[in-house]
Design a protein with these regions (language model features):
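Extreme N-terminal leader/targeting segments of oxidoreductases
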Residues: 2-52
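Flavin-dependent oxidoreductases
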Residues: 202, 206-243
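N-terminal Rossmann-like FAD-binding beta1-loop-alpha1 element of flavoenzymes
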Residues: 51-77
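Glycine-rich FAD pyrophosphate-binding loop
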Residues: 70-90
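Flavin (primarily FAD) binding-site architecture
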Residues: 191-207
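N-terminal glycine-rich dinucleotide-binding loop that anchors FAD/FMN and/or NAD(P) in oxidoreductases
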Residues: 91-115
């Protein structure tokens, strides 16, 4: 005999009577659920062992970069060490979940269909939750494969060129466990880790190389000056080492 239950009709706002479990209802099998997760993840990982571009860091810059690369036909994989994608944008400014963009940034918001409001001449605001969740969704739908909870702990170097990433679970790194990593090959690697420049820092620390910068090393960051920082970011978002 079926079990009667009441449910809420979201579309019409009515409480309706329906049927619950019947003898014909599929019984969930925990083993199949586990097999599905393992098989699908294995397929996804195996398909991304060799890519055109590997992005390290899933904040807004990494997401937008990977989105445009994928839209232009490149095979792109993004690795984020944390559980959630989006970097610090979720919190807006000091946990006030609003962001401010200029006219150039608004064009990107418009392309992603993220709503914004004019606040002052040249200053637009947007809800940070809408902004970053939309960036995440549209980046995945553009064809980018995202792996969270994975850290890039080293680089593959061949003949003075970066040719891939050395990867491990973030949990392994946090627990200081001695677990050997795995690798992927990539024609290009993008360091989108923000202030820390983690990928370039590894490159500089472990190899006797000279970067394509003023000093040949990581220049580093300075105290806050928004106008200068925006210009420097635009000028210095470029290749700093082959690959």
């Amino acid at each position: 005999m079926p079990t009667l239950l009441w449910f809420w009709d979201v579309r019409n706002g009515n409480i309706m009577e329906g049927c619950g479990h019947t003898e014909e209802t599929m019984v969930l099998d925990e083993k199949i659920i586990t097999q599905a997760i393992i098989d699908r993840y294995y397929e996804k990982l195996k398909q991304n062992l060799s890519v055109d571009a590997a992005i390290v860091g899933g904040g807004p810059s990494g997401l937008v970069c990977s989105y445009y690369l994928a839209r232009n036909g490149f095979k792109v994989t993004l690795f984020e060490r944390k559980l959630s994608i989006g970097g610090g944008m979720w919190g807006g400014g000091m946990m006030f979940n609003e962001i401010v963009v200029q006219e150039e940034g608004k064009r990107i918001l418009d392309e992603f269909e993220i709503r914004s409001k004019l606040y002052n001449n040249g200053y637009y605001t947007a809800d940070s939750i809408e902004a970053i969740s939309t960036l995440c969704s549209k980046t995945v739908k553009s064809g980018v494969t995202i792996f969270n909870l994975i850290s890039a702990e080293d680089l593959i170097i061949r003949e003075n060129r970066v040719t891939g990433l050395v990867l491990n679970w973030t949990a392994v790194e946090m627990a200081h466990l001695h677990v050997d990593p795995l690798t992927i090959q990539s024609k290009f690697v993008v360091d989108a880790t923000g202030h820390a420049t983690e990928v370039v820092s590894i490159l500089q620390k472990k190899n006797d190389i000279k970067l394509f910068t003023e000093t040949g090393k990581i220049v580093g960051e300075k105290s806050l000056w928004a106008e200068a920082a925006e210009k420097d970011t635009m000028a210095n978002t470029r290749e700093v080492f082959p690959g």
